Curated annotation (Swiss-Prot):
Homotetramer. GO terms for molecular function: enoyl-[acyl-carrier-protein] reductase (NADH) activity; identical protein binding. It comes from Rickettsia bellii (strain RML369-C). Belongs to the short-chain dehydrogenases/reductases (SDR) family. FabI subfamily. Keywords: Fatty acid biosynthesis, Fatty acid metabolism, Lipid biosynthesis, Lipid metabolism, NAD, Oxidoreductase. This is Enoyl-[acyl-carrier-protein] reductase [NADH] FabI. The gene is fabI. The active site is at Y147, Y157. Pfam families: adh_short_C2. Pathway: Lipid metabolism; fatty acid biosynthesis. Catalyzes the reduction of a carbon-carbon double bond in an enoyl moiety that is covalently linked to an acyl carrier protein (ACP). Involved in the elongation cycle of fatty acid which are used in the lipid metabolism. InterPro entries: Enoyl-ACP_Rdtase_NADH, NAD(P)-bd_dom_sf, SDR_fam.
Length: 262
């Protein structure tokens, strides 16, 4: 491993579901840049996927994290404090909504799924940031993952668009709250990527085709594109950057209209 932008830094990586996850690509690049990592998993099923990936990059700190359970959050940070004392960066990479409601009309969203989607996809950032602040004694960086559906209507994205809008607003408010402790909070708004979570969105393949045809770079966003931006935001190169929504979408967000692809 060569010396890199994150040499001597420690970070928590959440949101890995498999080897196609954006969080996994970020973890791989962070390790290449010298970071020591803690991987989290949400359930026993995901533990079986996450642990081999952690081993692949020489990470032996793997811990359970269920953001719907306050005790689980407390336990994670207690373990981080015991093993590391302090740490430097956090990736908030989780999002969830009932796949049956990621199609059709937003107006048909159920109360239960609305609350669950906002809790897991947005409020979890607030909870993790609150605990992280206690252990980021020398400042730090928190990065979360968003999508263009936070600001424009994307067919079938529905309640996730509302959750991502709340997430982006939370980034700005958290950046203000935590700035006095030199903790930076930013979001990466990535283009659509073939991941486990992306695949549950109705007509996702059409979304990919339209994105590639419309974006100035004429391609879809890759996990590695997002990973590079995340490592930059974790590093001292971004020491003056906070409260930002950083687009990594091959330029899609600057376009005024979509190209229709059959």
């Amino acid at each position: 491993m060569t010396t890199g932008l994150l040499q001597g830094k420690r970070g928590i990586i959440t949101g890995i579901a498999n080897n196609m996850s954006i969080s996994w690509a970020i973890a791989q690049l962070a390790r290449k840049h010298g970071a020591e990592l803690c991987f989290t998993y949400q359930s026993e099923i995901l533990e079986k996927r996450v642990k081999p990936l952690a081993e692949e990059v020489g990470c032996n700190f793997v811990s359970e994290l269920d953001v719907t359970n306050p005790e689980s959050i407390t336990n994670l940070f207690a373990e981080v404090k015991e093993k590391w004392g302090t740490f430097d960066f956090l990736l908030h990479g989780m999002a969830f909504s009932d796949r049956n409601e990621l199609k059709g009309r937003y107006i048909d969203t159920s109360l239960g799924n609305f609350n669950n989607s906002l809790h897991i996809s947005c409020y979890s950032l607030v909870e993790l940031a609150r605990e992280a602040e206690k252990l980021m004694n020398d400042g730090g960086s928190i990065v979360t993952l968003s999508y263009y559906g936070a600001e424009k209507v994307i067919p079938n994205y529905n309640v996730m668009g509302v959750a991502k809008a709340a997430l982006e607003a939370s980034v700005r408010y958290l950046a203000n709250d935590m700035g006095e402790n030199n903790i930076r909070v930013n979001a990466i708004s990535a283009g659509p990527i073939k991941t486990l979570s992306g695949s549950v969105i109705g007509d996702f393949n059409s979304m990919l085709r339209s994105h590639a045809a419309t974006a100035p770079l004429k391609r879809n966003t890759l996990q590695q594109d997002v990973a590079g931006a995340a490592v930059y935001l974790f590093s001292q190169l971004a020491s003056g950057v906070t409260g930002e929504i950083h687009y990594v979408d091959c330029g899609y967000n600057v376009m005024g209209s979509n190209k229709i692809v059959g």
